[in-house]
Amino acid sequence: RSFAASAYSSIIYEGYDFSCVLIDATGQLVAQSGEDHPFHVIPVAWSVKGLLEKGTPIDDSLVYLHNDPYTGGTHLNDVAIVYPVFEAGELVFFIVLRAHWADIGGMTPGSLSGAAREILQEGLRFNHVPVPKSGIAPVMDLIFDNVRVTREAKADFHAAIGTCRVAERRLRAVLAKYGVATVQAAAAGVLAAAERRMRGAISTVPDGCYRFTSYLDGRDHDRFPLQVDVAL
């Protein structure tokens, strides 16, 4: 709600095209809002794991911008702010806000074109670009100079940073009340419970080989198949 109340773009304050999640220090999704979008939330863990796999030390003074579809993004307009939270010098959680930017550069206004033949035509790609938590940096000037609705982009970006600060404040209140170890144990318990339920559901499926085929929308001219084969 903080983001919807402070953003400038109608796609945010009317369309609610954004999601906010909490990720643990290993890159596991542990919490999300009931209003979040699955197509934002599901890839977020890969956005964070990609940052961790780089091996670069996570800096408490930085956030990391990510939208690369090859490493956990969706389409380029959906930009994730990966906001690390440290306690007593230890990385404990990541707050991640993924939101649709009205324009991210590229060949057409809005950065969405059926005529694009390569990703470079779709706009700017961010693969964990470090930015100070203030949101003020030369790299942001470069980014804003290469999108079409600069005023909205700046306002939405700073609204997103502010929302992450609100989330951090609320998270720190929980950590102060219950302790880091207890909160981390609770998060691990949620993941373990989810695994038990999923394994229980899978165990009811008879052993065998299963196949399902579907097709991408809008490809009637060649009907490119997407096939999944599963053996139990």
Task: Write out the residue ranges for each language-model feature.
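A short, hydrophobic, proline-anchored segment that marks a local hinge/packing element in signaling
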Residues: 78-88, 96, 231
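Gly/Pro-rich turn-and-neighbor structural signature
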Residues: 4, 8-10, 16-66, 175-231
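Gly/Pro-rich active-site capping loops and adjacent beta-alpha segments
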Residues: 86, 90-146
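N-terminal leader/propeptide and maturation segments of large enzyme subunits in energy/redox metabolism
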Residues: 125-198
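Short, small/polar residue-rich loop motifs at catalytic or cofactor-binding pockets
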Residues: 14-17, 77-79
